[in-house]
Amino acid sequence: MNKERFDVAIIGGGIVGLSLALNLLGVGARVVVIERGSLDDMAAATFDGRGSAVSAGSQLILNGTGLWGPLSASAEPILEIRVADGTSPLFLHYDHRDLGKGPLGWIVENAHIRRTLAQEVKKRGLPVLEKVPLSAAHFYPSYVSLDLDDGRSVEARLAVAADGRHSAVREMAGIDAVSWSYPQTGIVCAVEHEVSHQGVAHEHFLSSGPFAILPMTKNRSSIVWTERNEFAAKIIKLDDATFAEELHSRFGSFL
């Protein structure tokens, strides 16, 4: 059986895997992505409340490879960061003007990142073996051979495991992982507010865990609410009005 050969094979076509693949493709590397899901599903992604912070350094990389242009319309600049311990009126204050001309970073909806990456993959002709899981990986001194569930096989000088925290590639490579569980749950949502957030990100370290308010486009904020498991389970089941009351007790009335 003839095997396709590449410089880099990236297993996992999520945000990390596709971003790396497009960057490597831009510098002339022969790259293939192996993804058990579908690019069409990524291209049809809708807002699920989650956003990602893009640092100034990451923005430079994305800009250099032409990815920042299509992302920028949905990117909200972070101009200030305010960090407080509990309900203390005192806070640490970071201002972009103290560090340089540009923002401290940006918040971008995950759904928009996924759609943009899927579109750029098709536009640039990046090879993606989709809708097929990896069945085996064979590691040699100078290359790796990857077998797919549908009988295909590829070889690459380098394999990148971008298939998540329960990485099958990591396990196939015999790389151990140490993990533990915190008795906490992350509740993520987005809110619209009347007062402009002015590009300010807030983070409060409460006894139950961090509570973050991150600026988004269209005068919205992404909420990352960490809560104890037993209480979080009750919060998630609340109706919208009662949930809003619980959120307001932590959010406050400044927005």
Which residues are covered by each model-predicted region?
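Conserved Rossmann-like nucleotide-cofactor binding loop
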Residues: V16, L39, H166
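Glycine-rich FAD pyrophosphate-binding loop
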Residues: L25-R50
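Conserved FAD/dinucleotide-binding core of flavoprotein oxidoreductases
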Residues: L206-L255
